[in-house]
Swiss-Prot record:
A Pfam family: Glyco_hydro_76
Protein's recorded name: Putative mannan endo-1,6-alpha-mannosidase C1198.07c
Residues carrying sugar: N75, N124, N193, N229, N254, N257, N356
Coarse class of the protein's main subcellular location: endoplasmic reticulum
Transmembrane segments: 422-442
Its EC number(s): 3.2.1.101
Length: 442
């Protein structure tokens, strides 16, 4: 098996440099590129489990990219598979906390799926399941994460992880809180319910007060530990963090009919994103890992999410197209050149600015997601309207979704006893796994 694996890797990595012709001004060319890179992404899909072969949150992100593509092109080729996967992963309680993932689940993981469900609702996709609509699935995710708002440290905010025995429980981060903010903004607009605006404002005020979002220049930092009461902010910056807040402000700008407050925040985040996460040639990249070629399998998808959120911004605030679109066009041109690897000649790498736009020998689901999201963002002006219940959406709302299943997690600070048991269980499971591995080896 090891020899077979070696030869498979060798064959896959060998590039014939086929690439594909691409014209950012041609809808036909963009649609063709989307078909190519989506097919490459689906090479990682397992129909039996309805997941991609990656971390579970990336299945949610990948499915969202397919929903975005459906909205942009109207292509229904993969629509049945897309809906089936979104429904299959929702869990018994209709909250994207399935038993298979529950004890590894972070607020960001569950939230990514909530965004995917919200995207499905906004393009009028239906679950075909009477137990919950896509809107209800998004509301359940929102309500459960909101119920974990933790005032025992940092004056509020939600933690990265849900359970105290998971690494990262003592960390509050921008992506978890930014997703909560964006979901509130989207639900406000979709349902025409100002209660969600108030909740979005609550998350925004906390994020800016604690310093995750710096209103001086709209830098969005990764997060902080509760052990310092969030007084020591992590300086790392990731593209999806600024993107998730940007899209939230764009939805609120649109919902409030051009509020100058949300316009100011939207423009600040937009300008920060374009200035920091694009090269001088206007090519999107991840400055925290791409220059050192150290991006992990999660991080390769981050810039694709930023491209998605920039696309939403162009749809919701059309005057931003003149500013944003040239960056998306340059990035898409670079991506087309960089999607020239593998045995098929069209596998995508992640460093699109690298070596005159040739393949960088990297491949994976994240690379494909980023290419899909960047190509579809080119079609933001032609994409289907982001619907609401007042403009033709039919996905039913249930503000109480996720609050009555008896399984909502309420976070309380871990006691010494909790931490002790968590440490013991971690050791015990590790020891059993080690013994099992030794048994398999011999």
């Amino acid at each position: 098996m090891r020899y077979l694996s070696f030869f498979f890797e060798f064959f896959f990595l060998f590039s014939f440099a086929f690439a594909f012709d691409f014209d950012v001004t041609s809808d036909d060319s963009i649609n063709s590129a989307l078909t190519t890179v989506t097919d490459g992404m689906l090479n990682y899909y397992q129909s039996t489990s309805h997941t991609f072969t990656a971390y579970w949150w990336m299945t949610g992100a990948g499915l969202n990219s397919m929903t975005d593509t459906y909205a942009a092109t109207g292509n229904t080729t993969h629509l049945d598979m897309l809906i089936s996967a979104l429904v299959a992963n929702k869990g018994d309680n209709n909250d994207y906390a399935p038993n298979s993932e529950k004890f590894d689940l972070g607020n960001d993981d569950q939230g990514i799926w909530g965004l995917s469900a919200m995207s499905a609702a906004e393009v009028n996709m239906t679950t075909g399941d009477s137990s919950a609509s896509f809107t209800e699935l998004a509301q359940a995710v929102f309500n459960e994460i909101m119920s974990r708002w933790d005032t025992s440290s940092c004056g509020g905010g939600v933690r990265w992880q849900i359970y105290s025995f998971n690494n990262g429980y003592s960390y509050k981060n921008s992506i978890s809180n930014g997703i909560l903010f964006q979901l509130a903004a989207r639900l406000a607009r979709y349902t025409n319910n100002d209660t969600y605006v108030d909740l979005a404002q609550k998350v925004w005020d906390w994020s800016t007060t604690v310093g995750f979002v710096d209103l001086d220049d709209y830098t969005v930092y990764d997060g902080a530990s509760v052990t310092s009461n969030c007084s020591s902010i992590t300086n790392e910056q990731w593209s999806y963090n600024v993107g998730v807040y940007l899209a939230g402000t764009a939805f609120l700008y649109n919902y409030t009919n051009g509020s100058s407050v949300w316009q100011t925040h939207m423009e600040g985040l937009m300008n920060k994103a374009l200035d920091y996460y694009f090269t001088s040639d206007k090519i999107i990249y991840e400055p925290s890992c791409e220059p050192t070629e150290s991006c992990n399998s999660d991080q390769t998808a981050f810039k694709g999410m930023l491209a998605r959120f920039l696309g939403y911004t162009m749809q919701l605030a059309p005057y931003t197209v003149e500013t944003i679109l040239p960056y998306i066009q340059s990035s898409a041109e670079a991506a087309a050149l960089a999607c020239s690897g593998g045995s098929d000649g069209v596998t995508c790498g992640y460093m699109w600015y690298w070596n005159n736009g040739t393949w960088d020998d990297h491949y994976g689901l994240g690379e494909q997601i980023s290419a899909v999201e960047t190509f579809q963002a080119l079609l933001a002006q032609q994409s289907a309207t982001i619907l609401t219940l007042d403009t033709g959406a039919s996905s039913e709302s249930n503000p109480d979704a996720g609050t009555d299943d008896g399984d909502t997690v309420t976070i309380t600070p871990a006691t010494k006893s909790d931490k002790g048991w968590a440490g013991f269980l971690t050791f015990a499971f590790s020891f059993v796994f080690l013994l099992f591995s030794i048994w398999l080896y011999f």
